[in-house]
């Protein structure tokens, strides 16, 4: 497993006014601190450890209140993990802002370190504005009221004997039955996701991308995505 590192917060980032009361180290699945400024400060330490690249958790902006849809032990949680994006062009305020991110990449490069972005092309968070107002009728596979649940059967995508139902649920099912599944067969969705990746590369100078939940996305999308990059 990859080691997980949490580096301290500057005071303004502890509990941002736009998303209050989501940082509490005594509660599981809350923000526990750690921001981009803290990572910048510790870059020499990471360099001395022999680290060559930083793979950060997704820095997309996430829901600014407790998540009442995704729960833990029947209690609402925060989207501390970063995989429930509400703005694919925003930086989560608990971590910092775009300027801080650009400074991090620049500082890492000065030390010969690379920065990897964790992206999510498969789904959005359940609180994204698109869920209630999708840009196109086929933006998502299904709706919050009616959709398939993901059955995690990745093998079906390579097995000609797999049932169409299992294959469809694997590609179009909502992750954990709560994360709205983007329809990459919609040309506008495809264009948006590719342009978003190109924007992050250009805006930050990042060095690599890790795609979350990539097996649940049509392979022809990845063909176009990789060709564009």
Predicted regions and their residues:
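Substrate-binding/active-site clefts of carbohydrate-active enzymes
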Residues: 1-199, 203-204, 224-229
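Short catalytic-loop micro-motif centered on adjacent basic/acidic residues
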Residues: 116, 208-214
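Acidic-and-aromatic substrate-binding clefts and catalytic sites of carbohydrate-active enzymes
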Residues: 94-97, 214-220
């Amino acid at each position: 497993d990859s080691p997980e590192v949490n580096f301290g917060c500057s005071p303004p980032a502890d509990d941002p006014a736009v998303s209050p009361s989501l940082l509490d180290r005594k509660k599981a699945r809350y923000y526990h601190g750690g921001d981009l400024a803290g990572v910048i400060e510790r870059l020499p330490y990471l360099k001395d450890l022999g680290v060559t690249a930083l793979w950060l958790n997704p820095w997309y902006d996430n829901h600014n209140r407790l998540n009442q849809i995704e729960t833990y032990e029947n209690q609402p949680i925060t989207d501390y993990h970063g995989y429930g994006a509400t703005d694919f062009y925003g930086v989560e305020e608990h971590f910092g802002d775009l300027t801080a991110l650009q400074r991090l990449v620049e500082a890492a490069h000065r030390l010969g370190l690379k920065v990897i972005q964790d992206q999510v092309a498969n789904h959005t968070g359940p609180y994204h504005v698109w869920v209630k107002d999708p840009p196109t009728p086929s933006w998502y596979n299904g709706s919050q009221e009616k959709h398939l649940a993901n059955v995690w059967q990745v093998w079906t995508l390579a097995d000609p004997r797999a049932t169409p139902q299992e294959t469809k649920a694997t590609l179009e099912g909502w992750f954990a039955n709560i994360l709205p599944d983007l329809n990459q067969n919609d040309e506008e969705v495809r264009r948006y996701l590719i342009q978003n990746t190109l924007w992050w590369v250009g805006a930050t100078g990042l060095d690599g991308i890790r795609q979350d939940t990539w097996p649940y996305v049509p392979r022809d999308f990845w063909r176009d995505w990789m060709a564009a990059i």
